[in-house]
Regions:
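Short amphipathic alpha-helix that is part of the acyltransferase structural core
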Residues: 2-27, 115-161, 266-267
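A short helix-loop-beta-strand connector motif used in the catalytic cores of GNAT acetyltransferases and
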Residues: 33-48, 56, 162-171, 193
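Acyl-donor-binding surface of acyltransferase catalytic domains
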Residues: 38-144, 255
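Conserved acetyl-CoA-binding loop-helix of GNAT-fold acetyltransferases
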Residues: 68-73, 195, 205-219, 238, ...
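Conserved GNAT acetyl-CoA-binding A-motif
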Residues: 76-87, 220-232
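Conserved active-site alpha-helix within GNAT-family acetyltransferase domains
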Residues: 89-100, 210, 232-250
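A conserved beta-strand-loop-helix scaffold within acyl/acetyltransferase catalytic domains
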Residues: 160-192, 196-200
């Protein structure tokens, strides 16, 4: 285990040396970081690049030789989902952070480009009840998404609207001009996006998420982008399967709230 190393961002010329450490992972957010589209790669300082972290928004993928300093490093997030490459990383996270890291399971969805039925997806969009309207996210809707905690993740990965306009894609459903559900690109990589789905609590289980997600998937297919899906819970798996995806496997993550530096000094 590597100890007592200064952590720094990976230099562009080092990415090719780091990429093999992530070779066994089919995670679009890792691809975003490696391609330099979004996110960052972090490494312990030194000439031997044997450990790395791919961090994008709330996700941090830890790979290579376990390094305690990469677990305790402040990635600048109030909430972080740490994804260990293997059991050695998982053991290190538990050893270093203890009960400050909540053990959770997430659900990987297969990446199958030909799994979608465009007619079925179009029907799901058109099934939207009359009191609702669906809109592509523009500047006004981008700003409205940021006004509420439940909808902020639809666009918060993009520091400004211009960034979202350049890289992002998304749709929201409104009622009387107010956003009640949405589907957007949580992140972007060269060949596609990672999907984010959010619905205001009192509007859930009304088919709104299916309509918004269908509109997003159809637009991705029209643009030649792959709409990747990763599920937080089994309800998200069920929605994905309704839209044509297939479940792949469960995987372990650790949810860490608040600043890591503060956490580690708290009794």
């Amino acid at each position: 285990m590597i100890m007592e190393n200064k952590i720094r961002k990976c230099l562009p010329q080092e990415v090719d040396r780091i990429a093999p450490l992530f070779a066994d992972w089919e995670e679009t957010m890792i691809w975003s970081c490696l391609q330099g589209v979004m996110g960052d790669i972090y490494v312990p300082d030194g000439k031997y690049l044997v450990s790395a972290a791919a961090q994008l928004n709330d996700f941090c993928f830890l790979t290579g030789e376990p390094c305690a300093d990469m677990v305790t490093f402040d990635y600048g997030r109030d909430f972080l989902i740490m994804v260990p490459q293997n059991e050695s990383w998982a053991e290190l996270i538990e050893e270093v952070l203890g009960d400050k890291a909540a053990r959770r399971m997430r659900y990987a969805i297969k990446k199958e480009p030909n799994c979608f039925d465009a007619c079925k997806l179009s029907a799901l969009v058109n099934m939207l009840p009359k009191q609702y309207e669906i809109h592509r996210i523009n500047r006004t809707l981008y700003e409205q998404c940021l006004e509420n905690a439940w909808s902020s993740d639809l666009v918060s990965g993009y520091p400004a609207y211009e960034d979202f306009e350049r890289l992002g894609i998304g749709f929201v459903i409104t009622e009387n001009g107010k956003i009640v559900s949405g589907a957007s690109s949580y992140s972007r990589y060269n060949e596609g996006i990672e999907i984010e789905i959010d619905t205001k609590e009192e509007y859930r289980r009304n088919g709104l998420a299916a309509s918004a997600a269908s509109a997003l998937i159809l637009e991705c297919l029209n643009c030649g982008l792959y709409p990747s899906w990763d599920a937080h819970n089994k309800a998200s798996v069920a929605l994905a399967e309704k839209l044509g995806y297939s479940f792949s496997h469960e995987y372990l993550v650790y949810e860490v709230k608040n600043n890591l530096a503060d956490l580690l000094t708290t009794p």
